[in-house]
Amino acid sequence: KLPKELPETGGIIGGTNGNIITYWIDEVQKTKQSMCSYVPDTDKMNSIIEKWFNEGIEFLGIFHTHYYGVKTLSDADKDYMRRIMNSMPESIKILYFPVFVFPNNEMVLYAIKYQTMEIMLCNYYII
């Protein structure tokens, strides 16, 4: 299900066996965002991630929305991805960072690998 929020809002995705099964939208932050950047409520996100962990759900990454037609990552997006991956335990080998692009709610899936910090564009399919 694609978010219907304004550009530069976001949240987190969780799942099992590499499949996304749940998500959380950062409701508090959407009222505080500029139209050019997304700043997540990390305290709330971390509490959701901890809750998911206790339920057997893995943290798989963070999504956010972009302005009309912008499918590429900004330098700030890439820096944020690297900082998040650097804070993960070594058991986390990859994190996903979907970007939902308005106006067609197109999803562009990016990921980052732990060992190399390589950011890549990924193929995906919806079940």
Give the role of each language-model region.
Residues 1-60, 67-127:
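Conserved beta-strand-loop surface patch within small alpha/beta domains used
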